[in-house]
Amino acid sequence: MNLSQQNQHSNPITEAAKATFPYSVPMIAGFLFLGIAYGIYMKALGFGFLYPTLMALLIYAGSVEFIAAGALIAPFSPISVLLITLMISARQIFYGISMLEKYGIHIGKKRWYLITTLVDESFSLNYMAKIPPHLDKGWYMFFVSLYLHIYWVLGAAMGNLFGTVLPFNLKGVEFSMTALFLVIFAENWLKGKSHESSLLGLGIALVFLLIIGKEYFLIPTLIGIWLILTMRITKLETKLESLK
């Protein structure tokens, strides 16, 4: 084996890229399916190939991208979008705290990309990863996040192209965002041992809907849910602990 072959064999970037691909493969189906749904949804709203592709590349936040898509065709309401995004993505704060050590300054500039691409799946894979000692941990986590990012962007691009090339009937596909949130709510309901916070959210939304009307109830509802849950967080945590 000559010197160049030895250098190539010992290249930490190449080794990490090869090792992480099989680890990320189980996520392909989910990322591509949701990405394709997002691309088709964007097509139904009248946006071309570049919009979903660039939004998937730069926003990279699943359900937030569906919100952004709807916001692009809705009356300008940045406060509503901001509040919804904060509520949906608040869990990222806890992901970030959990990954402080793994994503520390010791891995160099790669940490900025890792922080930017910290989504549910990359958190799960990188947090639970049993990285072989001969691999560079920073590059390993970097490529896990990169592959997931690529799967999502490809899915969004493919979905929009399919919406253009194939004779899909896209009427009603805009309901997919509503369906997405219904599925998330149902999943949390089934997994949760206590439904108090979910019932509070539904109750507050219903009250404001009846009082203010459907045109303006969203922002008061979000603020109300945040205030009530903040005031009751200690009681809710105690109740959850007793159910474990």
Swiss-Prot record:
Stored InterPro entries: Brnchd-chn_aa_trnsp_AzlC (IPR004471), Brnchd-chn_aa_trnsp_permease (IPR011606)
Transmembrane segments: 21-41, 44-64, 66-86, 139-159, 165-185, 199-219
A single cellular component GO annotation: plasma membrane
Localization terms from the record: Cell membrane
One of the protein's GO biological processes: L-valine transmembrane transport
Bilayer topology term: Multi-pass membrane protein
Primary localisation category: membrane
Keywords noted in UniProt: Cell membrane, Membrane, Transmembrane, Transmembrane helix, Transport
Entries under PANTHER family matching the protein: INNER MEMBRANE PROTEIN YGAZ
Similarity comment text for this entry: Belongs to the AzlC family.
Name of the protein in its database record: Uncharacterized membrane protein HI_1738
